Amino acid sequence: MPQRIIIALVETDAYLGARDKNPFNFQHFNVREICLYKDGMPFPRPMARLDFKNGKVAESYHNFMLALKGSYSRFVPNVTIDEFKEGFTLFVYDMSPDQLGSVNHESLLNRYSNVRLEMKFAEKTPTSITLLAYSERYHLLKIFEDRRVNIDL
């Protein structure tokens, strides 16, 4: 089970390398609802309801800031809520048991779980889009003197 999941949406042309488009322009494409499910249950809370046109995105922005910072990190994303709405839109889910991004609880995480993402859009997307999913996992990597590599999954 990953410690953190980050979801981004980008225009497919930009993702495929169109020279006139920025592949790091992560847009919201008027997502109306987004929910991550862990083993069939909404995680960490019920579905987020968004309204980008009217600026109602505070909950997702708050989750973005908390999940990327955590209480054990000195990293604070330098993204304002206006930037979040205009091209820095990342949906971040902290999957750690304490919801603080802590690596100290690896033993409490289920090794195997089913994760599902549901998204609904307020209107038809203007172009084809690509969903990028990044998961962060903490594993133990051992390299022995005979150059054998062992990864503890």
Question: What does each model-found stretch correspond to?
Answer:
Residues 1-153:
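Flexible assembly/topogenesis modules
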